[in-house]
Amino acid sequence: MWKNTLFTEDNLHVMQGLDDKIIDLIYLDPPFNSKRLYDAPVGSRAAGASFNDMWTWDDVDEAYLEDMISNYPSLVQFIQSVGDIYNQNMKAYITYMSQRIIQMKRILKDDGLIYLHCDSTASHYLKIIMDKIFGKSNFINEIYWKRVAVSGKGSQFKPKNLVQIQIVF
């Protein structure tokens, strides 16, 4: 097992290689489904890199759908409802997230904590997913904070969408 290692990018396959109940704390800051394309700034070390935060069914690892259907039928029903009510892109996003959160539950110790960082785009869906995977009784709290941005615009500055959410189980 890796010790004191930080993994970036898609974590699904890394988690599948880990034993059950070995992790004390998980903090995740996943994509928010913002429907935007993010490009690294020109001149930065990451110049030329980009991240597409728009989700389709191509982003879902279909090999793990059978496990979800067998072990989390109410979660699958919820995901289907979101697709019917909202749209197929949100359905793809929350399926993608559910597959990873299921693995996180498996590797998290019984007395471990998980902090999910998100914004209002899908926080309400992610909270229900966490309830269905971890159980409603394991919900601890939500933490909200408003980020403060410094601007030279003085009183003309109007912050937008700076509230961040942490869902804790």
Model regions and ranges:
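Core catalytic lobe of class I
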Residues: 1-169
